[in-house]
């Protein structure tokens, strides 16, 4: 399919969308939306509406970020008249809507004769009003940046297209809606867009909104390659899994993203962690990796090695089938078993046996496998599981001891209350 690339320069104040809504009955309207020029980031919706049947009595604007699943509706106060001009602001920064999110909006109008009219749905993509943005896009990918010339943007765009093609082949799926990457030049600019974010955060991904916001400075080719291949993996996988109620474990999501990076740095880390006994239990890799820098680094590397082993052992077709099974709402253990012939615990133990200082399979199952019923949080560990059992034993013992005391007390009370023989 031929893809049309559109290159556009966006001004500091964006006139992002607008159009005339043809009349349906007596009401007609023209709606626009723009990004205001001052921070915080705010969308400004405006409308001119007319009715030939009476006064416009009610106006309400509806808007939502595409992919959010939640539509916001806000009534607008105004003086009723046959022709009105309405406006409404929306603080996107306060509502944690990232730069690059695609916004859909329309207006609903009512006049005094009871006529109603919805304007056609329109879209705009607000970025950050502090910078002069450039965007290169087609139906699959949009790259927005301000630091660097057109050649730099073209390089990012081509790298992103290469990453998407690799992901589509690896997952056996096509991109169903455009994914967008927004590149800030440095940490200060990034922090200005996300003022409440921890200072150590260097990027944000919004898979449901199909947006990733990253720090990529002009000319940083190696970093740009790494970021695009990694971050686009999360966005594509989210599209693949749309409609499924089965969660993708963190080791599979992050492991696939790491696997897609052009250069792997994980093999040596994991061999060293295996030799020193610093590998993380499988339970740790199911959810959020936490905030401990050393553990997070091991978690990412371990996840990449797990995905690498899975692809090599189960094959490309089997790997794709795992995701297809999950799309059909098979949990990960069943999805692996159906596609590869083993559940997740057996898979993990098989991988573990390929590393130095490998424990016995039985030991690996005891220490590293999650409970069948639920995946522990990132903070969980086998030590905490063992301590929980010990606490349970103490609790049962205490109940038994208290029971003995209660029996003794009851026995004494009965003896004291027993009627004594009458005196003669």
Name the predicted role of every residue range.
Residues 8-18:
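Bacterial N-terminal signal peptides
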Residues 21-133, 139, 424:
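Glycan-association/targeting regions that enable binding to alpha-glucans and other polysaccharides
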Residues 125-127, 167, 171, 410, ...:
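Polytopic transmembrane helical bundles with strong interfacial aromatic enrichment
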Residues 132-249, 266-267, 288-289, 299, ...:
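Juxtacatalytic substrate-recognition/specificity segment
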Residues 199-211, 216, 222-227, 239-385:
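Acidic/His/Gly-enriched intrinsically disordered linker/tail segments
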Residues 383-403:
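Juxtamembrane/start-of-transmembrane alpha-helix segments at the extracytoplasmic/lumenal side
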Residues 398-424:
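C-terminal membrane-anchoring or membrane-association module
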């Amino acid at each position: 399919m031929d893809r049309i690339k559109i290159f556009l320069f966006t001004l500091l104040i964006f006139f992002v969308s607008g159009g005339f809504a043809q009349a349906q009955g007596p009401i007609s309207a023209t709606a626009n939306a723009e990004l205001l020029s001052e921070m915080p980031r705010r969308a400004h919706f405006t409308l001119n509406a007319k009715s030939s049947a009476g006064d416009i009595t009610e106006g309400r604007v509806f808007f939502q970020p595409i992919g959010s699943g939640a539509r916001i509706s806000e009534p607008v106060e105004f003086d009723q008249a046959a022709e009105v001009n309405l406006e409404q602001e929306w603080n996107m920064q306060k509502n944690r809507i990232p730069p690059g999110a695609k916004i859909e909006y329309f207006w609903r109008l009512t006049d005094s004769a009871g006529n109603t009219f919805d304007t056609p749905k329109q879209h705009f993509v607000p970025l950050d009003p502090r910078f002069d943005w450039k965007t290169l896009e087609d139906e699959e990918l949009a790259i927005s940046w301000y630091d660097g010339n057109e050649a730099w943007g073209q390089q990012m765009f081509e790298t992103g297209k290469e990453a998407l093609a690799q992901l589509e082949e690896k997952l056996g799926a096509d991109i169903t809606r455009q994914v967008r990457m927004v590149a800030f030049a440095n940490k200060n600019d990034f922090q200005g867009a996300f003022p409440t974010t921890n200072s150590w955060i260097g990027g944000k991904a919004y898979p449901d909104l199909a947006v990733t916001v990253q720090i990529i400075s002009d000319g940083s080719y190696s970093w740009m390659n790494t970021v695009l291949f990694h971050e686009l993996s999360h966005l594509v996988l989210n599209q693949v899994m749309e409609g499924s109620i089965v969660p993708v474990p963190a080791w599979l999501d992050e492991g696939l993203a790491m696997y897609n990076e052009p250069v792997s740095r994980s093999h040596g880390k994991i061999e060293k962690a295996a030799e020193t006994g610093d590998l993380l239990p499988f339970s740790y890799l199911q959810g959020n990796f936490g905030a401990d820098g050393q553990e997070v680094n091991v978690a990412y590397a371990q996840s990449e090695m797990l995905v690498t082993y899975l692809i090599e052992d189960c094959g490309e077709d089997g790997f794709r089938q795992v995701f297809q099974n999950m799309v059909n709402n098979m949990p990960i253990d069943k999805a692996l078993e159906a596609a590869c012939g083993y559940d997740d615990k057996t898979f993990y133990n098989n991988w573990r046996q390929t590393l130095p200082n490998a424990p016995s399979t039985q030991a690996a199952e005891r220490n590293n496998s999650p409970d069948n019923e639920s995946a522990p949080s990132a903070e969980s560990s086998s030590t905490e599981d063992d301590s929980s059992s010990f606490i349970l034993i103490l609790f049962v013992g205490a109940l038994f001891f208290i029971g003995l005391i209660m029996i003794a007390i009851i026995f004494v009370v009965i003896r004291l209350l027993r009627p004594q023989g009458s005196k003669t």
